[in-house]
């Protein structure tokens, strides 16, 4: 699995898992929503371990850009809120930051 696939899968699992809690606490859905929500959050954590990075902190920092962009897509697809130009600009800045973290030149040891 590539790092990008792991990041995207992790984002879907984290957003879906967190949305289960949102649905329960904010939308009045059944607490049974927590069962798939917790499973999704566990899968999210597992998927981040598949990222090609020797450092957890670096993997998590890079993941942040994917998470932000994915959350905006989720809001559009699942909640009907189309991202505005500021959402898109902010996500673009985050994705550029993610690329710097992942692909910036550094010594081979780290």
Curated annotation (Swiss-Prot):
Q: Which organism is it from?
A: Afipia carboxidovorans (strain ATCC 49405 / DSM 1227 / KCTC 32145 / OM5) (Oligotropha carboxidovorans)
Q: Sorted alphabetically, which NCBIfam families does this protein's record hold?
A: PRK02237.1
The record gives the membrane topology as:
Multi-pass membrane protein
Under what name is this protein listed?
UPF0060 membrane protein OCAR_5428/OCA5_c25530
Localization annotation: Cell inner membrane
**Which family does the similarity line name?**
Belongs to the UPF0060 family.
Sorted alphabetically, the keyword list is: Cell inner membrane, Cell membrane, Membrane, Transmembrane, Transmembrane helix
Q: Which Pfam families match?
A: UPF0060
GO (cellular component) term, any one: plasma membrane
Transmembrane ranges?
A: 4-24, 31-51, 59-79, 88-108
- Name the domain of life this protein comes from: Bacteria
Q: Does the keyword Membrane apply?
A: yes
